[in-house]
UniProtKB/Swiss-Prot annotation:
It comes from the Bacteria. GO terms for molecular function: ATP binding; ATP hydrolysis activity; ATP-dependent DNA damage sensor activity; damaged DNA binding; single-stranded DNA binding. This is Protein RecA. Keywords: ATP-binding, Cytoplasm, DNA damage, DNA recombination, DNA repair, DNA-binding, Nucleotide-binding, SOS response. It comes from Yersinia pestis. PANTHER family: MITOCHONDRIAL DNA REPAIR PROTEIN RECA HOMOLOG-RELATED (PTHR45900:SF1), RECA (PTHR45900). GO terms for biological process: DNA recombination; DNA repair; SOS response. ATP binds at G67, P68, E69, S70, S71, G72, K73, T74. The gene is recA. Belongs to the RecA family.
């Protein structure tokens, strides 16, 4: 229904007054906002980039990555840092767990000489550092490892055994309110790593929950559940982990998709193995028996040899990566290489019993 002329004049006057008082762009028609096309940073995993629907993690937003111990949470965030640094972006790592290994980070491709790192004493200090870096407008990616290690000052100064009900949840809730707008204005990606706890007395449904209350769940644009589902072996020697990531929440594309990839010890995500698997699935790589061929040329017998060929020929790997991204991310007709999660997972994934 068309708005009558008087209402249009009144609306135009109101919009003019708002823009005069709060600045241009403070209010706009949703269809006119071209900035809705969100800039993203690759996760280092092609299948996860595709599962996210936009080609990576969104800039200017909050992301939560959670899972059990040794599931690959920190590795995934270090791969994000490496990808961001390759694009010339500035990154910071807030190491609240005091457990960051610079040698391992360097092996994953992180430029440790240009990585800002802080090991804060309290949770409040960590979040204030995040806010200061964000307001500077000069930092593109901030990692907080982890929410569970963001200990409130009152708890640190108190005695072991003292009750501090809801302190961490209140601290996180206040920080989210303060950070969300600044992150959008600075176009900074803030990633929180989180741990899993078990809810006591749950008879039905998922007993797992994450630490830090409900605020992070609400403010996060993307939530990723990462799990180790098996071992990668070279003969009898375990050389890595089979990893599955489920997109529990996604505000920039369809949620509840999942991706599977390998994390090799000392190397990180096996991107070349992903290229082989996705290339075969989408008929860019031919597979005859145990042999793999690309553009008519044999590239190896067995997946491991084909992956090594791509590792030794980065130009071919980059070409294959580009073709797959164009096919699967830019409106191509290729079949989506990610499976929808079950309804049971979707219903139970966001449950929590912590105070807001």
């Amino acid at each position: 229904m068309a708005i009558d002329e008087n209402k249009q004049k009144a609306l135009a006057a109101a919009l003019g007054q708002i823009e005069k008082q709060f600045g241009k762009g403070s209010i706009m028609r949703l269809g006119e906002d071209r900035s809705m096309d969100v800039e993203t940073i690759s996760t280092g995993s092609l299948s996860l980039d595709i599962a996210l629907g936009a080609g990576g993690l969104p800039m200017g937003r909050i992301v939560e990555i959670y899972g059990p111990e040794s599931s690959g949470k920190t590795t995934l965030t270090l791969q994000v840092i490496a990808a961001a640094q390759r694009e010339g972006k500035t990154c910071a790592f807030i190491d609240a767990e005091h457990a960051l290994d610079p040698i391992y980070a360097k092996k994953l491709g992180v430029d440790i000489d240009n990585l800002l790192c802080s090991q804060p004493d309290t949770g409040e200090q960590a979040l204030e550092i995040c806010d200061a870096l964000t307001r500077s407008g000069a930092v593109d990616v901030i990692i907080v490892d982890s929410v569970a290690a963001l200990t409130p000052k009152a708890e640190i100064e108190g005695e072991i055994g003292d009750s501090h009900m809801g302190l961490a949840a209140r601290m996180m809730s206040q920080a989210m309110r303060k950070l969300a707008g600044n992150l959008k204005n600075a176009n900074t990606l803030l990633i929180f790593i989180n741990q899993i706890r078990m809810k006591i007395g749950v008879m039905f449904g998922n007993p797992e929950t994450t630490t830090g209350g409900n605020a992070l769940k609400f403010y996060a644009s993307v939530r990723l559940d990462i799990r180790r589902i098996g071992a990668v072996k070279d003969g009898d020697v375990v050389v890595g982990s089979e990893t599955r990531v489920k997109v529990v929440k996604n505000k920039i594309a369809a949620p509840f998709k999942q991706a599977e990839f390998q994390i090799l010890y000392g190397e990180g995500i096996n991107i070349n193995g992903e290229l082989v698997d996705l290339g075969v699935k989408h008929k860019l790589i031919e597979k005859a028996g145990a042999w793999y061929s690309y553009n008519g040329d044999k590239i190896g017998q067995g997946k491991a040899n084909a992956s090594n060929y791509l590792k030794e020929n980065p130009a071919i790997a980059a070409e294959l990566d580009k073709k797959l991204r164009e096919m699967l991310l830019n409106g191509g007709n290729g079949e989506q290489p990610v499976a929808a999660a079950t309804a049971e997972f979707a219903d139970g994934a966001d449950e929590t019993n912590e105070e807001f």
